[in-house]
Amino acid sequence: MTSPASPSSTAEPTPDPDRPTEPGPAALFDAIVAEHAAIYGYGLVSPHVMPDDNELVSKALAEHRDRREAAVALLDERSVKVPLPAVGYQLPIVVDSPSSAAKLAVQMESDCAVAWRAVLEQTDIEQDRSFGGTALTQCAVMAARWRRVLGAWPVTEAFPGGSE
């Protein structure tokens, strides 16, 4: 997972004091954090993919940006403070080849799917549930496209965003 970078390798990131305490808004807040991380991560994926996959990077980046902005608007409508992007992120792997770039893309899509599934599980607001379902589906489809780039099988997951 791409996570906010900490000052030392043993320190855990400090929880955001602006994170809502209610489960629904908190899950949406966390999904925005995941979207920020994915946007950052695709900036590292882009220079390492094969030229044939540049369009996939562009599409993924546009989806994450659009999704983040729409989710920010949902929190804004409720006067909930939105998370800011971290100044840097700790990557789960070194990205130095087309293969490692695609693996990071799969991981980021999976991380976002987990976050959007949590929105579905935690909120009772119909607008958020609908948005979360669409977001989860988009992340699952994008992860499948990246798994295909890797030649992985199967390319899909039965229950995206979960450990089933």
Enumerate the predicted regions with their spans:
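All-alpha RGS (Regulator of G-protein Signaling) helical domain and cognate RGS-like helical scaffolds
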Residues: 1-164
